[in-house]
Amino acid sequence: MADTSALGQSVPKSQEGLFLMDGIEGLLSLPRHSVDMLLTDPPYGTTRNYWDVPLPLDALWEAVRWAVKPNGAALFFAQCPYDKVLGASNLAMLRYEWIWYK
């Protein structure tokens, strides 16, 4: 993995531009307010899969507020009932609910 410089800070990144780390840890490693849009599909905790464990929401929102610009956007994919939990966990940042019909 090559180190690249972003606003004077070194951020681990692959050649393809992908950050290879825990999402919360990754957001906190970025320069403050350096992200225009965060698009993520976090685990919902609605299955019995070992990896499907909901993120600690307080830590998640702290990381989002750190990395995303004040006028930036944070978009989360989620399914019911986790979408309600996620939205209610930070009403101050909740703006819209978009529904993707497949």
Model-derived features: where do they sit?
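Core catalytic lobe of class I
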Residues: 2-102
